[in-house]
Structure formats: structure tokens, C-alpha cells
């Protein structure tokens, strides 16, 4: 009987199955399949609670901005330590609404990283403003405050740091720069819910925080959704008006807004998930620490650079992104695909080199660290339900690609349970969690 999540590789023309160590001509290898994501595992645990929540909304007939939306907003504000949390239709809309609330006009400049998802820049250009791209810190992949300062001008009207992959940007430096220049900060926290900087949650540090409920996020819905946070009453009032066509009261429009409301069914499902977010985050942190341990055990440091340990807070690991130097990233990814290991490249083409921004005049070489990251980075599976065995498979396949000998310490619990407990689940492993800066006493 074939185990679930396995794939039989066909025999190739040389008479050996791909990646087989068996020289028999008819040998076939069963390779475990490790997906980049496994949303079905999360759903399976919560299936009944989600069903009840959806039926409650359907029975109420309140499908738009219903009671569950109000409750979710209150719960998010409490969890993140902010006075205001306002939901909307997507993380992309959250960015657009934030800039609208800050009264960004055509011709204004907004400084942001080029190494980010497209929505960060598209929100700027939709308002006729100009994205000014800053380079990144090569250790963290986050916007470089020094380059932000260099890019400031009299036309600068906002700064958007992106808390990429689950790590908060250097907000101390950015806040000082923004204050001196008199410009607001919009935090793109789409990938970083519950991450912290010096004890404060992402989304609570700048003027506005923007989050996404896209299903692959750490707190994901069953479709699109997003929300914004702010400590400023005036911005909260504007956001609440802008998301409903600027309408207050009904059919009386004070400003030209957009239609960006969170469905009640999405809110109901997210309320089921929110109490689990902290434990899911802890699981992601444990998985990150285990990867660190495994890469060390396989002596892969000369081939692969794992995420840096520098942190001033809680890293929530929306993605685990490694660097693969010497032009081998794409070949490694192809190898892992053949081995049924899911990966992704975030992001293969920096925004300043995208075709749609050609008119801005950016050239290759303008942002060297951003461009190097786009050529070298590869995301590995990091979802909360990922098992230690699956992680050993992932790192083992990477070691296979680089022809690295077997790991120094046995980590297969099925054959060496005591060694596995000592190396991955024992005190040394727990120390590794602290070492990567992702287990602290902060619970926001």
C-alpha cells in the first residue's frame, strides 16, 4: 500500500530511479511529498467550529459588516494593543486606504522597498503618487533605514516599511527619520501579525498598520480580507468612512471612498482561528529553530545561508527564506521540485525592474542588495503543522543536491529516538529557539 503524500518516480533511461541509491534496473523510490503549504491540515482540525460559525452568519442574514465583523475588530485591537482595528476587503485595499487617509496626492513621493509584493507599490501608483524604492539590509531582507534617509526629498509624503517574511523592520531608526522629516509611516504588516519590535506589535508603531487575511498568511481566512490598525483617532475616523464609499449617513457621501468591506462569513471564520494564532506562531518558531539545527548538522553553511539571528523582537516566520549563492538557486529549486518538495521564490523580479514601472527610469544595478536577494532567495515550507520528519526530508534533499555527507547527528526518531530527542526536541533544541530571536515573553 502506498503511503499518503508520496510519489512514485518512474525509472529513467539509465535504469535507475531518480535519486535512487538502489542500482537494480527496476528499482522505484517512494519520495515523501512535502508541500510549501498545507492549509487542509489546519482546516481539518477546525472543521466543525468553522461550520458552526458559517451557519450562524447564514442564519442571521447579516453578511456585510455584521456582528462578527465588529467583534473581530475589537478582538484584533485587544490582541495587538491598539485602540483601533478596522477591517477591509484585502491587504491590498488596506494599503490603499491607509494612503488615502493620509491624503496622498498625485506627484507625492512615497518611499518603500523594491523587495516586496506588488501591492505595496501599486497602492502608491493608484493615487498618482510616485514610489521611491529603497534598498534592503542583506541580513534581514528589510528596508535599509540609511537608504530611506538618502531617498528623502521635499516631495516625500510617507514611508512604507514592509515587515517581510514575519520580521519587523528597524522601527527605531525609521521612526527617528520619519519624525525628523515630518512624514508619516505606513507599516505593511501583511506577513507579520504578532511580530514585535522592542515589545510592541507590528502595526502599532507607525501611523497606520496594514494587514492581510489572505489564506496563506499566519492568520488567514477562506478568501480575501484585510484590516488596518492605528493609534490615531482622526485616521480611524477617515478609514471607517473611506471603506464605505465615503458614505455617512447612508446615501450621503462626504468624500470619494472605495468599496472595501470584510464579509461577515470571513470574520466569523477568522474569529474561530484567532485564539489559535499564538500557538501556530510558536509552532512556526519551533520549525525555524529546527531548520537551523538541521542545516548545521548537515554542514550546509558553506552552500546555504539561513535567516539571520539579529532580532529586536518576535519573528513570526510567515516564510523561511534561505540564500543560495553561486547561481545555484534555480537548480536547487528544480531538484527539490523533482523530489516533491514545495518551494517558492519571493520575489524573482524586484519592483523597480518590473515592466509596469519602466517609465520611472530605474535601472539594473540601482538597488544591488535587492537584486542579489531576488537572484539568491528560496522559501522552504514553514507552516505550523509541518512535522520534524518532513523538515528532515527537506534538508536532506538539499544536502543531496550539494552532495553533502549524512548529517553528523542522527535525527530520525523512527530509528534513533533517543538521538532525535536530544538533538531536536531536547534542551539544546529549545536553546536554539531562543538563539534565533523568536521565543520571548512577549505576547501581543
Report the location of each language-model feature.
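Conserved active-site segment immediately N-terminal to the catalytic lysine
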Residues: 187-222, 249-254
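Short beta-strand-to-turn element immediately C-terminal to the catalytic PLP-Schiff-base lysine
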Residues: 211-212, 226-232, 271
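PLP-dependent aminotransferase class I/II
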Residues: 21-28, 40, 52, 69-74, ...
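N-terminal "arm"/small-domain region of PLP-dependent enzymes with the aminotransferase-like
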Residues: 2-62, 442-444
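Phosphate-binding glycine-rich loop
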Residues: 60-109, 123-127, 132-135, 200
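Structural detector of well-ordered beta-strand residues that form the stable sheet scaffold
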Residues: 86, 111, 132, 185-186, ...
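Hydrophobic/aromatic ligand-binding patch that stacks against planar heteroaromatic rings
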Residues: 123-124, 177, 201, 218, ...
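PLP-dependent aminotransferase-like
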Residues: 100-189, 196
Amino acid at each position: 500500500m502506498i503511503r499518503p503524500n508520496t510519489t512514485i518516480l518512474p525509472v529513467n533511461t539509465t535504469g535507475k530511479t531518480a535519486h535512487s541509491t538502489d542500482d537494480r534496473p527496476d528499482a522505484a523510490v517512494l519520495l515523501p511529498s512535502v508541500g510549501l503549504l498545507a492549509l487542509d491540515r489546519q482546516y481539518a482540525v477546525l472543521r466543525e467550529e468553522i461550520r458552526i460559525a458559517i451557519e450562524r452568519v447564514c442564519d442571521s442574514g447579516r453578511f456585510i459588516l455584521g456582528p462578527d465583523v465588529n467583534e473581530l475588530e475589537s478582538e484584533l485591537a485587544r490582541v495587538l494593543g491598539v485602540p483601533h482595528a478596522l477591517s477591509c476587503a484585502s491587504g491590498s485595499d488596506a494599503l490603499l486606504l491607509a494612503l488615502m487617509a493620509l491624503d496622498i496626492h498625485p506627484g507625492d513621493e512615497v518611499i518603500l522597498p523594491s523587495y516586496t509584493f506588488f501591492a505595496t507599490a501599486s497602492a502608491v501608483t493608484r493615487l498618482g503618487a510616485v514610489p521611491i524604492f529603497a534598498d534592503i539590509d542583506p541580513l534581514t531582507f528589510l528596508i535599509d533605514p540609511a537608504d530611506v534617509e538618502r531617498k528623502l526629498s521635499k516631495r516625500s509624503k510617507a514611508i512604507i516599511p514592509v515587515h517581510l517574511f514575519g520580521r519587523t523592520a528597524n522601527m527605531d531608526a525609521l521612526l527617528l527619520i520619519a519624525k525628523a522629516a515630518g512624514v508619516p509611516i505606513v507599516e505593511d504588516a501583511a506577513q507579520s501579525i504578532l511580530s514585535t519590535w522592542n515589545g510592541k506589535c507590528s502595526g502599532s508603531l507607525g501611523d497606520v498598520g496594514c494587514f492581510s487575511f489572505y489564506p496563506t498568511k499566519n492568520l488567514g481566512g477562506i478568501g480575501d480580507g484585510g484590516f488596518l490598525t492605528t493609534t490615531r483617532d482622526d485616521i480611524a475616523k477617515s478609514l471607517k468612512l473611506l471603506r464605505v464609499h465615503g458614505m455617512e449617513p447612508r446615501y450621503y457621501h462626504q468624500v470619494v471612498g472605495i468599496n472595501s468591506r470584510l464579509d461577515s462569513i470571513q470574520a466569523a471564520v477568522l474569529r474561530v482561528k484567532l485564539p489559535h494564532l499564538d500557538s501556530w506562531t510558536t509552532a512556526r518558531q519551533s520549525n525555524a529553530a529546527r531548520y537551523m539545527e538541521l542545516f548545521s548538522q548537515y554542514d550546509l553553511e558553506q552552500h546555504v545561508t539561513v535567516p539571520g539571528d539579529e532580532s529586536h523582537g518576535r519573528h513570526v516566520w510567515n516564510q523561511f527564506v534561505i540564500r543560495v549563492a553561486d547561481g545555484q538557486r534555480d537548480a536547487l529549486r528544480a531538484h527539490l521540485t523533482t523530489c516533491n518538495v514545495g518551494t517558492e521564490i519571493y520575489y524573482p523580479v524586484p519592483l523597480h525592474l518590473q515592466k509596469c514601472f519602466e517609465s520611472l527610469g530605474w535601472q539594473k544595478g540601482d538597488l544591488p542588495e535587492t537584486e542579489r536577494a531576488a537572484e539568491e532567495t528560496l522559501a522552504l515550507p514553514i507552516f505550523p503543522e509541518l512535522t520534524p520528519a518532513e523538515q528532515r526530508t527537506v534538508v536532506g534533499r538539499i544536502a543531496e543536491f550539494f552532495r553533502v555527507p549524512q548529517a553528523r547527528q542522527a535525527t530520525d526518531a523512527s530509528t534513533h529516538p533517543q538521538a532525535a530527542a536530544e538533538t531536536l526536541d531536547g534542551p539544546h533544541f529549545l536553546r536554539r529557539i531562543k538563539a534565533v530571536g523568536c521565543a520571548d515573553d512577549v505576547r501581543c
